[in-house]
């Protein structure tokens, strides 16, 4: 409802526009069907192997929290705070630019000074926190599950982090948004040269 009230649902999200461009380059003509397939695939992934960390944690037979669980949940909570702060800083920046009647400016304040996409990095770390917290539960399944099933669950658990990284950087996150930012923001290319795309770090001196 908030997005609708702000008029954000009146046009296609940039990441979907970018997907259409990618499909056209790969000679996919039925982009509407491709969009439906991708949406269904994302829903299936979210309801299956991407949910494995949550399934493991919720089905844990362990009575007390282990060290890994405490570390994982701490990373989870800190990452949520990190993402919230990043979103707040971006929103505050946009409001200030609107107040000053400045358009197409680059947000490089706060967390955005250290990575071009602190919100995506934080979201990835949220998943990593859950993965770490689920490891003790996964280990406890060794005696109750078949060896091959146990190994397959472990592989899926490891790939959850990798898949989320690829998704947040290349498919629906950083790269698609930068495709348009570089076109409409004159200073964005300079920002790209000086600031890491995903992992936080100090600015590069050219």
Segments (PLM) and residue ranges:
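Hydrophobic transmembrane alpha-helices
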Residues: 43-89, 98-206
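Membrane-interface helix/loop boundary segments of multi-pass membrane proteins
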Residues: 92-94
């Amino acid at each position: 409802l908030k997005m609708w009230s702000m008029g954000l649902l009146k046009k296609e999200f940039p990441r979907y526009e970018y997907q259409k461009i990618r499909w056209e380059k790969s000679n996919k003509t039925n982009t509407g069907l491709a969009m439906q397939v991708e949406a269904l695939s994302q829903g299936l992934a979210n309801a299956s192997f991407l949910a494995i960390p949550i399934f493991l944690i919720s089905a844990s037979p362990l009575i007390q929290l282990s060290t890994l669980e405490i570390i994982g949940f701490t990373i989870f909570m800190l990452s949520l705070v990190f993402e919230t702060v990043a979103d707040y800083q971006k929103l505050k920046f946009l409001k200030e630019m609107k107040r000053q009647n400045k358009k197409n400016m680059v947000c490089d304040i706060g967390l955005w000074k250290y990575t071009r996409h602190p919100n995506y990095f934080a979201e990835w770390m949220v998943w990593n926190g859950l993965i770490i917290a689920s490891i003790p539960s996964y280990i406890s399944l060794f005696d109750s599950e078949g060896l091959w099933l146990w190994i397959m669950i472990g592989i899926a658990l490891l790939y959850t982090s990798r898949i989320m990284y690829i998704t947040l950087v290349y498919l629906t996150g950083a790269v698609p948004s930068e495709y348009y930012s570089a076109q409409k923001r004159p200073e964005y290319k300079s920002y790209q040269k000086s600031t890491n795309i995903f992992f936080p770090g100090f600015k590069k001196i050219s």
